[in-house]
Design a protein with these regions (language model features):
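Residues lining hydrophobic/aromatic ligand-binding pockets adjacent to catalytic sites
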Residues: 1-115
Length: 115
């Protein structure tokens, strides 16, 4: 993950739950409760769910904790791969190896609306 963040020039702090627990934060629970606890521990005001987040997230839990939520509507981009026909749903490492610095532009075009 750190390599991908560096290559895609994404500069964000990285927090590990194990470290938060070592610091005394209560990072337990399931689904929305767990996510909200993680957000509160790192003072996050926004959370982006994957496409399936709508199926399990509890809006009230986020609203009660003043955490904004968004849903990713990622549409997998088609791009030229080195060998054979395009194979969908590969790791972003595949995209990086096939397109190098152009990968971020390819990904950016496929993010879709997050509302």
């Amino acid at each position: 993950i750190i390599l991908l963040l560096k290559e895609y020039q994404v500069n964000v702090p990285i927090h590990r739950v194990s470290k938060l627990k070592e610091q005394g934060y209560d990072i337990t629970g399931t689904k929305s409760d767990l996510i909200v606890k993680m957000c509160r521990a790192v003072k996050a005001k926004n959370f982006i769910f994957g496409t399936l987040g709508r199926t399990y997230m509890n809006k009230k839990t986020f609203d009660d904790n003043n955490i904004n939520y968004y849903f990713q509507n990622f549409e997998h981009p088609k791009y030229k791969q080195l060998h054979g026909e395009f194979v969908s749903n590969m790791s972003s490492i595949d995209l990086l190896f096939n397109h190098g610095k152009d990968s971020i532009e390819i990904l950016g075009k496929s993010l879709g609306d997050t509302k």
